[in-house]
Design a protein with these regions (language model features):
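Extracellular glycan-recognition surfaces and repeat-rich motifs
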Residues: 622-653
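Glycan-recognition surfaces
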Residues: 242, 246-312, 359-501
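Aromatic-lined carbohydrate-recognition surfaces of secreted/lumenal glycan-active proteins
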Residues: 187-190, 229-243, 337-340, 357-372
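Carbohydrate-recognition beta-sandwich/jelly-roll modules
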Residues: 1-186, 191, 227, 494-522, ...
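Aromatic-lined carbohydrate-binding/catalytic grooves of carbohydrate-active enzymes
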Residues: 146-332
Length: 653
């Protein structure tokens, strides 16, 4: 589909092989003099050819193993790109050995892009082909959401303790909404089902009664959507527990093999049977029915009618269910697929099942679901998994998809290599709702503003030019990125440049400019952000505290003054008017304290107080934080001797 030969002296191939190790890039750069091996064939995830005048790439929807969708053939004096093989029936080479009735794949498709100096930097290289490639590549369902989800976190429930009932999670969404002035959120419920995390794995419709049941779960989704928040769940399609209502020996591998065994012994699911029999999809549809009040699966959960060994029928096609999901405003938003080890074809199939129900697809491991996954746990949870299992270590992939997903290498200098201060940052998972023992809300807010808001700001732009340090240049970090340029469709330009002076902590030393104006320097910034109602505001953060002066962005420079609010878990406080002088403002900030600047007085309040749909108003006392005397005992008196009140006292043991 694309080729070059030795008559083109400046020809080069640039491609990507899978690597999630922070110190080993998956990128290959081959020229006639460096790396060219005649009469050989290699397979790659992405591939580009350039010749000094043009640069091009090939896209394919091949479902080949390891997502190596592009084949590069080297002749005696040529390099060419074509699609890797396609599978139409029964999936990959391993799947063909089985006899289940699999769904057929999409019809084969390949596309070619060719560009000149697409980014206008005066050089024609893979950057130009990659920029053109964005117009032909697939985009995962829900990928456009990622750049907005500044508050992405895990909510943990385990072993029947119900430490985070659904409506408490709703209150925490409101608390973070106030503390971040409405920055979008995504909460992933790790333990939404049965008695919590890993209980009754594979039984997706078993929404936990102890955490509030299906009604509270539905109310959580409705409340979350009012506060610009996505709700998703952790599921497992690898293992089944005997306590699951649909557990049966037919669904297990033969011979039976053990899976994870910390609550009860789980057993490995025969994924090909689960796919081919439609049992897995039926279990997912039964969950969809419970959330949305539909009846696409014939079995009624409340009547004890479970999928078992693929009993019951689906009353609509996958496309018909997808059409229903597209119309709903209070459907769940995403699925996180835990411990999934299958290759590309099977992963594409389960992603289709999940996407058809209106749910964005995300995975545990960075190497899974390259075609469809929008978020990876091990790519974002810094210490989790070790240096060898993070996100994709590829400048080419990050160039193409930085704005679409959280599956790249994040900033974690102790792992070295690409993780040592990447210029674009990378979403880092923090929380306060139990996962990993995290319970510190204040620490969560600090890291959200220090690391994750700048990452999300950059993801609102796509990469157009990538410059690394040369071999003869001294780079102050293990990551050799020197300067990255990004743009958006309206013509705004962002430039991220590495600062040579290094801090003593792990935060990234860089300068970010927007249309030539500095908006971030190391750990202080004044970043523009568009609110959910379309209004623009500016977030100010200075980790070290102190005074700093900033040029205001276009649309703000002619103002006489701006209004600055300090942010707290009670929302905006300590209003202050700041004068504008020659298009600049000088801001005095407390250390590690967030501020928001707006063009005039305004408010950001809760639509309904804490405790919405609950039995008690504000059961977590969130509305009293920092109010001191409002918690005096005299304000909380009552008749404890009333016969209707029962007091139970327990001795410490």
């Amino acid at each position: 589909l694309l080729s070059t030969d030795m008559s083109e002296e400046n020809a080069a191939f640039d491609g990507v092989s899978p690597s999630t190790t922070t110190t080993q890039s998956g990128d290959s750069h081959i020229t006639w003099d460096n790396g060219f091996n005649p009469s050989t064939t290699g397979t790659y995830m992405y591939g580009f050819l350039s010749n000094g005048s043009l640069s091009g790439g090939v896209w394919s929807n091949s479902e080949i193993e390891d997502d190596k969708r592009i084949t590069m053939n080297s002749g005696a004096d040529s390099m060419s790109l074509t699609s890797s093989v396609w599978y139409y029936e029964r999936g990959d080479k391993n799947g063909q050995a089985a006899s289940y009735s699999y769904p057929t794949s999409d019809l084969p498709c390949a596309k070619v892009c060719i560009a000149g100096d697409a980014n206008g930097d005066g050089d024609i290289d893979w950057n130009d082909g990659a920029l053109a490639f964005r117009d032909i590549m697939n985009i995962a369902q829900g990928a456009d959401d990622i750049k907005d989800l500044v508050n992405y976190r895990i909510v943990m429930n385990f072993a029947g303790m119900a430490t985070n009932p659904y409506l408490e999670t709703a209150d925490n969404i409101k608390k973070v909404y106030l503390a971040t002035d409405g920055l979008p959120q995504a909460v992933m419920l790790k333990g939404y089902g049965n008695e919590g995390h890993d209980s009754a794995n594979s039984e997706y419709a078993d929404v936990s009664e102890r955490e509030g049941g299906i009604t509270d779960f539905q109310n959580l989704i409705k409340i979350a959507h009012q506060y610009n928040t996505e709700v998703g769940i952790h599921i497992n399609a690898q293992e089944a527990y005997p306590e699951a209502k649909s557990f049966n020996e037919t669904m297990l591998t033969s011979p039976i093999t053990n899976g994870w065994g910390w609550l009860d012994q789980s057993f490995t699911i025969n994924k090909l049977w689960d796919l081919g029999s439609q049992a897995r999809y039926k279990r997912l549809v039964q969950l969809y029915d419970r959330i949305n009040g539909t009846s696409f699966y014939s079995g009624n959960w409340d009547k004890g009618e479970y999928v078992k060994d693929s009993q019951g029928t689906l009353n609509a096609s996958m496309s018909e269910i997808a059409a229903d999901a597209a119309k709903r405003t209070d459907n769940m938003d995403f699925i996180y697929l835990d411990v999934w080890y299958q290759n590309a074809w099977e992963t594409r199939q389960i992603a289709k099942e999940i996407n058809s129900l209106g749910w964005r697809f995300s995975t545990e491991f960075g190497y899974e679901g390259e075609y469809d996954s929008t978020w990876s746990h091990w790519a974002t949870d810094a210490a989790y998994g070790g240096a060898g299992l993070k996100g994709w270590n590829s400048e080419i992939i990050r160039f193409l998809r930085n704005d679409q997903r959280d599956t790249q290498i994040l900033n974690y200098p102790r792992y070295g290599g690409t993780a040592d201060n990447p210029l674009l940052g990378g979403y880092r998972l923090y929380g306060f709702e139990g996962w990993g023992g995290d319970q510190d809300h204040n620490s969560y807010i600090t890291e959200t503003f220090t690391e994750n808001l700048p990452t999300r700001f950059l993801q609102h732009y796509y990469v157009t030019d990538w410059e690394d340090y040369g071999e003869d240049e001294a780079c102050p970090t293990g990551n050799t990125e020197k300067q990255i340029t990004l743009k958006n469709d309206t013509g705004d330009t962002v430039v991220v440049t590495r600062n040579t002076e290094q801090r003593s902590d792990s935060y990234i030393e860089r300068t970010i400019t927007l249309n030539g104006k500095e908006v971030l320097n190391d750990v202080k910034y004044l970043l523009p952000w568009t609110d959910e109602n379309g209004d623009q505001k500016l977030y100010h953060w200075n980790l070290d505290g102190g005074t700093s002066t900033w040029e205001l962005p276009d649309g703000w420079t002619n103002l006489a003054n701006v209004v600055m609010y300090e942010l707290s878990d009670q929302g905006r406080i300590n209003e202050k008017t700041v004068a504008v002088s020659n298009g600049t403002v000088t801001l005095d900030a407390k250390a590690a304290t967030a501020y928001v600047l707006v063009k005039g007085e305004s408010s950001k309040t809760l639509k309904v107080d804490y405790g919405e749909d609950n039995y008690v108003v504000d059961p977590g006392f969130n509305g009293y934080s920092g109010t001191d005397s409002a918690l005096d005992a005299a304000d909380w008196s009552g008749d404890i001797d009333n016969a209707a009140v029962t007091v139970e006292k327990y001795a410490n043991t």
